[in-house]
Amino acid sequence: MYLTEQIMDRPKPRTVKELADTLVIPLIDLLIPCKFCNRFLSYFELLNFDHKCLQLIWTEEDLVYGLCSSCAYASAQLEFTHFFQFAVVGKDIETVEGTAIGNICIRCRYCFKLLDLVEKLATCYKFEQFYKVRNSWKGLCRHCGSVE
């Protein structure tokens, strides 16, 4: 069995690191196009892709796509503008969801990074808002919160 056949028989990699490991090549040598603009992700964007806990997009033809920083920001803005539902202040998100904040999936409203517990608690501590957008929760990550 050829290496490509072995790769195709496995579940498709979800992260940039998994893809590099599967192909047995250095991460820096990966060429992954953005799903929206088709520009190849830079090395920094490849690292950030996994840091943000995003997942690779696979087509039926076994083509793989990622999401560049520019398109992530543009997509997040479009989504927030057109699909905003409501906002809650800090810890009120637990009441709305009926579970502890650590169990709630919240992504950054600007870059789509999955927020960690410290980022979620910082939002609560500062009495800032979480936003329900397209049936998902959004907040601010450390980086975007420091830029805003």
From Swiss-Prot:
The gene is E6. Belongs to the papillomaviridae E6 protein family. It comes from the Viruses. GO terms for cellular component: host cell cytoplasm; host cell nucleus. Its main location: host cell. Keywords: Activator, DNA-binding, Early protein, Host cytoplasm, Host nucleus, Host-virus interaction, Inhibition of host innate immune response by virus, Metal-binding, Modulation of host cell apoptosis by virus, Transcription, Transcription regulation, Viral immunoevasion, Zinc, Zinc-finger. Forms homodimers. Interacts with ubiquitin-protein ligase UBE3A/E6-AP; this interaction stimulates UBE3A ubiquitin activity. Interacts with host BAK1. A zinc finger (unnamed) spans 34-71, 108-144. One of its GO terms (molecular function) is DNA binding. It is found in: Host cytoplasm; Host nucleus. Plays a major role in the induction and maintenance of cellular transformation. E6 associates with host UBE3A/E6-AP ubiquitin-protein ligase and modulates its activity. Protects host keratinocytes from apoptosis by mediating the degradation of host BAK1. May also inhibit host immune response. InterPro entries: E6, E6_sf. GO terms for biological process: DNA-templated transcription; regulation of DNA-templated transcription; symbiont-mediated perturbation of host apoptosis; symbiont-mediated perturbation of host ubiquitin-like protein modification; symbiont-mediated suppression of host innate immune response; symbiont-mediated suppression of host type I interferon-mediated signaling pathway. The keyword Signal does not apply. This is Protein E6. Signal peptide: none annotated. SUPFAM superfamilies: E6 C-terminal domain-like. HAMAP family: HPV_E6.
